[in-house]
């Protein structure tokens, strides 16, 4: 069962919660808190504490002092803003908040890709935004005629004006588009007073075109206000207002700015890490302030899609057939898929490639990866996508499967094929090939 354990006394304490959902509060000295199994809450309070939630999605707050956290689940959430803290991370692709000074990956764990990490605020750690929706995957939305009663921010009511029919139509078009990209649905509601509810309204803003809140456990989460300037009256394609609309919805879904410098027009600093150089551009993320008119439409850019699919997963109704994704050598390849039996095809590239069909990995055409994922010939599969098959080029490739049953064909060249998990069929093709089935009952064919 669940346990509530409090140790206010001084002296080092080693506390185990055992099975069940535990609430453990340490004392005023250095404690060692172990949640063990279950969904646990651990508070270290004072001292240099060790916190290990164990199995399950755990909340850990070391309090003051130099604390050590053990993270073993992608849903483990750390809240600690003081001291010099360390996290030992034994599972891959975890969002670690930037206020943890030292991160050590163990057990072969891999860090979250920088192009996703840079668009997620600290509040997104522990997959918090996804957990707010639960299994329904549903956001609600409302166009209030007055400032909602729960909103105590007086500035939100300054010049308050409800959305016009044109603004409503464009907003609903944006939401329909988003539901075709990520695994959420949007339902209109008659009341703004609810959790996971987007509020859309106009007001007077002195230095910004719009403002939005991240998702949260309070009703103010995901509320969006737009300046009453004329350009925002239509959110028309080809106008900056269209970019403003999709940008603010990005915030309301959980995306942050990618830049590390103060911006004119109210753009605040975001949590590190950051995108730099050419990647801090709306060509790659609509959350950037470095914009061009090519992005003045109701569409996310590639890095936005990658980050949002990390949070919510890809739409299960889009790209739902048996799709073939042909890799380009002259553009980056951000691959995502909703359903079906799908193939990544390297037959069109002019040199060997390294490809991982497990989401989150960084593949590339050529002998080595580029400096940035947005460079030509880079290859990655977005989180939540399942690709079953992989076809190599006419050159020497390194091809890696995933945990499903894969069909991997090397083609010409001296290839390396690795099935990873699942019951895989590996076909080397002509050339001196090396085949490794990995975990599962695998079949290898040589020519």
Per-range role (PLM):
Residues 1, 6-102, 158-159, 232-245, ...:
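Acidic, glycine-rich calcium-binding repeat modules characteristic of RTX/beta-roll
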Residues 9-10, 316, 354-386:
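Acidic/polar low-complexity surface segments
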Residues 104-163:
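Disordered inhibitory propeptide/activation segment of secreted metzincin zinc metalloprotease zymogens
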Residues 143-145, 212-237, 286-288:
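Active-site scaffold of zinc-dependent metalloenzymes
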Residues 152-192, 339, 348:
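Zn2+-dependent metallopeptidase catalytic core
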Residues 176-196, 209-217, 233-234, 256-261:
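Short, well-structured beta-strand/strand-turn elements
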Residues 202-222, 269-273, 277:
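Catalytic zinc-binding patch centered on the HExxH motif and its immediate surroundings
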Residues 243-258:
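Active-site recognition of the HExxH zinc-binding catalytic motif
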């Amino acid at each position: 069962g669940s346990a509530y354990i409090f140790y206010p006394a001084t002296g080092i304490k080693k506390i185990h919660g055992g099975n069940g959902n535990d609430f453990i509060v340490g004392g005023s000295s250095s404690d060692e808190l172990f949640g063990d199994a279950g969904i646990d809450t651990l508070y270290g309070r004072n001292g240099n504490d060790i916190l290990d939630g164990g199995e399950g999605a755990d909340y850990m707050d070391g309090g003051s002092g130099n604390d050590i956290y053990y993270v073993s689940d992608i849903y483990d959430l750390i809240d600690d803003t003081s001291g010099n803290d360390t996290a030992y991370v034994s599972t891959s692709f975890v969002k670690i908040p930037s206020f943890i000074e030292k991160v050590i990956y163990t057990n072969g764990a891999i860090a979250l890709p920088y192009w996703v990490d840079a668009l997620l605020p600290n509040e997104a750690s522990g997959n918090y935004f996804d957990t707010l929706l639960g299994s329904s995957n549903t956001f609600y939305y409302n166009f209030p005629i007055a400032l909602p009663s729960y909103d105590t921010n007086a500035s939100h009511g300054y010049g308050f004006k409800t959305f016009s029919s044109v603004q409503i139509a464009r907003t609903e078009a944006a939401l329909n588009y988003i539901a075709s990209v990520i695994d959420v649905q949007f339902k209109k509601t008659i009341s703004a007073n609810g959790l996971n509810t987007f509020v859309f309204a106009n007001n007077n803003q002195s230095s910004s075109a719009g403002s939005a809140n991240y998702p949260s456990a309070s009703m103010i989460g995901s509320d969006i206000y737009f300046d009453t300037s004329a350009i925002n009256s239509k959110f028309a394609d080809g106008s900056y207002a269209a970019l403003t609309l999709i940008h603010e919805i990005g915030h309301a879904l959980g995306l942050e700015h990618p830049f590390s410098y103060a911006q004119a027009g109210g753009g605040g600093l975001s949590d590190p890490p950051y995108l730099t150089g050419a990647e801090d551009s709306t060509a790659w993320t609509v959350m950037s302030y470095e914009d061009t008119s090519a992005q003045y439409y109701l569409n996310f850019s590639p890095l936005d899609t990658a980050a949002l699919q990390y949070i919510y997963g890809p739409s299960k109704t889009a790209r739902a057939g048996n799709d073939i994704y042909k890799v380009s050598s002259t553009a980056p390849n951000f691959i995502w898929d909703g359903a079906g039996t799908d193939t990544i095809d390297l037959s069109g590239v002019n040199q060997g490639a390294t490809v991982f069909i497990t989401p989150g990995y960084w593949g590339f055409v050529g002998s080595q990866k580029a400096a940035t994922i947005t460079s030509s010939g880079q290859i990655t599969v977005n989180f939540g996508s399942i690709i079953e098959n992989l076809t190599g080029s006419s050159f020497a490739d390194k091809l890696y499967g995933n945990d499903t049953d894969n069909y991997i064909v090397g083609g010409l060249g001296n290839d390396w094929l690795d099935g990873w998990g699942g019951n895989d069929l590996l076909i080397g093709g002509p050339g001196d090939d090396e085949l490794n089935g990995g975990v599962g009952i695998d079949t290898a064919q040589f020519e």
